[in-house]
């Protein structure tokens, strides 16, 4: 069984006091069996068109960018088989992978900019 840590965090950015953004990761810990699908949920709030990112941090390593959304296609493909779908109507940017591997055990961070 794999344990994917998704820190419960809410990040709020205020730029000039008029444009506030926040992101909320809904799961604090996600456990999956190797070979099964992974879903890491992220919802955001933004007063304008956001740029959204998913980062991963493996034990004793620095942050690594998995993928980013910057207003192009709604389905974003990242590294190592991860992808995320931007759903403006649901204000979500959930990270998915069809088949988890032991090497995916790490902390994952959703960021809005």
Curated annotation (Swiss-Prot):
Signal peptide: 1-20
Glycosites: 43
Cystines in this chain: 42-110
Gene this chain is encoded by: TRAV8-2
SUPFAM superfamilies: Immunoglobulin
Record field: transmembrane: none
Domain Ig-like: start-end pairs: 21-113
Record organism: Homo sapiens (Human)
Annotated protein name in UniProt: T cell receptor alpha variable 8-2
Subcellular location field: Cell membrane
Gene Ontology CC terms: T cell receptor complex
Main location: membrane
A single GO BP: adaptive immune response
Complex formation: Alpha-beta TR is a heterodimer composed of an alpha and beta chain; disulfide-linked. The alpha-beta TR is associated with the transmembrane signaling CD3 coreceptor proteins to form the TR-CD3 (TcR or TCR). The assembly of alpha-beta TR heterodimers with CD3 occurs in the endoplasmic reticulum where a single alpha-beta TR heterodimer associates with one CD3D-CD3E heterodimer, one CD3G-CD3E heterodimer and one CD247 homodimer forming a stable octameric structure. CD3D-CD3E and CD3G-CD3E heterodimers preferentially associate with TR alpha and TR beta chains, respectively.
Keywords from the UniProt entry: Adaptive immunity, Cell membrane, Disulfide bond, Glycoprotein, Immunity, Immunoglobulin domain, Membrane, Receptor, Signal, T cell receptor
PROSITE patterns to which the protein is assigned, alphabetical: IG_LIKE
Role summary: V region of the variable domain of T cell receptor (TR) alpha chain that participates in the antigen recognition. Alpha-beta T cell receptors are antigen specific receptors which are essential to the immune response and are present on the cell surface of T lymphocytes. Recognize peptide-major histocompatibility (MH) (pMH) complexes that are displayed by antigen presenting cells (APC), a prerequisite for efficient T cell adaptive immunity against pathogens.
Disulfide bond listed as a keyword: yes
InterPro entries on file: Ig-like_dom, Ig-like_dom_sf, Ig-like_fold, Ig_V-set, TCR_variable_region
